């Protein structure tokens, strides 16, 4: 054994682990699955669901694996009669008040409680008293609530406190009367708030626009990239008979981890908006008239004459393939007037623009920087995933500074704010060194 590892035994199998590593992390690493509800690798340990109880040699009672650090010589049994009995007892308690909503619940087919109840639940309930009922909360247009289904794992609460930095959900009352709700009945409005839908292990928090529109097993999962996210967050599109029904995050530790911005989760609704242009139109005598594709292409071909008089603008959100096709069309027409910088006004230094803008480090390394300076951006609104990484850096002690025309709200400590005029004056009068000194 080295100083960096300890030797333990899991179900008779010798395993090396880091000192202080939580037992549930070790069992996951070797494929010895331990059931859980409150544990999540991106959140702090709560140990309040008790589903991950395991048997440890010498312990007087089963111990929650999510809250037990490993130690030298520990012998763990995840499938012993005592461990299984404890897990089944926990499941029975969880199901006492849980409603039989599976046939209509949007979480059906991908519900962690449903899956584990098959393995650890009883066929017949011994509980004859009335079930607890909780009033649903209206917490905004994006997340629907069925709080009678809530098992109080507090994943959503910890997400607000630890990931968002803006606690929006909390617990009130105690014991079996505990209720999770927003403070003073407010809506949740953080840029990442809808990630609680994915975190919820049951059907208590659901995707409101998607509600009752499809079942999990009916849809096809397509891997893609978020179209409105400048960092390229990885996502899955869930498609039913050619129609996008919902967007969920695709895990990528180097970019978005396991989160996506609400904008990227719900922007697919624009595809099917009533005011979206679905058919080609032509303007005649100041009025728009719908035409078929053949007439539209003929009209476009007739109008596209004279390479020097043509210009093409591509959406910055267009795919690489779409951009390539537009460039191919521009080449065929003999024009070089093609651009994607729709909002840019100053092109005086465009010859020095990088072909591929780059931070100088990977997105994942951003959270390990000692100092971060953001210029001219409301990073929370424009790139929520980057804002999340910057917040992680700030929590580790990084100095974070902003230069912009307006001061925006951030859920971490900001060391310096410079107005655009202040930054310009410093650069003009004293150069970059003065800016660095100002930010120290």
Located regions from the model:
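Generic start-of-chain signal for non-secretory N-termini
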Residues: 1-22
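Conserved short loop/turn motifs at secondary-structure junctions
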Residues: 14, 37-42, 146-147, 181-188, ...
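Fe-S ferredoxin-like electron-transfer domains
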Residues: 50-226, 231-235, 240-243
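Short, surface-exposed linear segments at secondary-structure transitions and domain or protein termini
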Residues: 29-31, 70-78, 255-257
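A basic, amphipathic helix-loop patch mediating RNA/tRNA/ribosome contacts
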Residues: 23-57
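Catalytic alpha/large subunits of respiratory electron-transfer oxidoreductases
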Residues: 95, 99, 146, 153, ...
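Residue-level structural signal for beta-strand termini and adjacent loop
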Residues: 20, 66, 249-250
